[in-house]
Structure formats: structure tokens, C-alpha cells
From Swiss-Prot:
Pfam families: Ribosomal_L31. It comes from Chlamydia trachomatis serovar A (strain ATCC VR-571B / DSM 19440 / HAR-13). The gene is rpmE2. Gene3D superfamilies: Ribosomal protein L31 (4.10.830.30). Keywords: Ribonucleoprotein, Ribosomal protein. This is Large ribosomal subunit protein bL31B. GO terms for molecular function: structural constituent of ribosome. The keyword Methyltransferase does not apply.
């Protein structure tokens, strides 16, 4: 087997940036940042959503939006008025009554 082909597998500290929740998990994530957790120093990875903040796991319907995407959307489209529904127009036959085509018959 070739040496140095796979990244190093190690314990990494993951930090949920929206709740501050920290947990350790094995990973090949590469970083220079480290943080002390429970008396040991670990490489750290900051995540925006984890099981402590995701609505599926928390059971809440609260939307956590760190980047402000919802606010940006609301600001952009809040001034737009909905257009009134267009009234239906009556379509009249163009061909005179005697010149109308009969519907095509299906062949058996």
C-alpha cells in the first residue's frame, strides 16, 4: 500500500456558531486553528448548523439564518405589489358557421 496517500484521521472539535454547542468527532478536516476542550487541545471546525440548532432535531420551526439571506430576500421583495388577476377574455370563433371543421375521427 502506498504511504502518505490518505489524509490524517484525528479527533476534531466541531463548534456550532449559532448556539455555541461543541462536540468531538473523528474527521480528516484540515485546519491550523486549535481550541482547548475538556482539558485537551483539538483542531477546531466552525459549522453554521448542527443537531443542536437544526429545526428537524430541535422540533422548533424557528429559522436560524446567520448570513441574513431571509432579511435580504424580504428587503428586496417587500415593496413589490401583487398584480391583480387579469380578467378572462372571451375568445370568438374566427371561421364562419358553415366553414367550421369537424373534429378528426380516430381510425381503428
Amino acid at each position: 500500500m502506498k504511504k502518505n496517500t490518505h489524509p490524517e484521521y484525528r479527533q476534531v472539535l466541531f463548534v456550532d456558531s449559532s448556539t455555541g454547542y461543541k462536540f468531538i468527532c473523528g474527521s480528516t478536516y484540515q485546519t491550523d486553528k486549535t481550541e482547548v476542550f475538556e482539558g485537551q487541545e483539538y483542531p477546531v471546525c466552525y459549522v453554521s448548523v448542527s443537531s443542536s440548532s437544526h429545526p428537524f432535531f430541535t422540533g422548533s420551526k424557528k429559522l436560524v439564518d446567520a448570513e441574513g439571506r431571509v432579511d435580504k430576500f424580504l428587503k428586496r421583495y417587500s415593496g413589490i405589489k401583487q398584480s391583480a388577476p387579469k380578467p378572462e377574455t372571451v375568445v370568438e370563433d374566427v371561421l364562419p358557421k358553415g366553414k367550421r371543421k369537424s373534429p378528426a375521427k380516430k381510425k381503428k
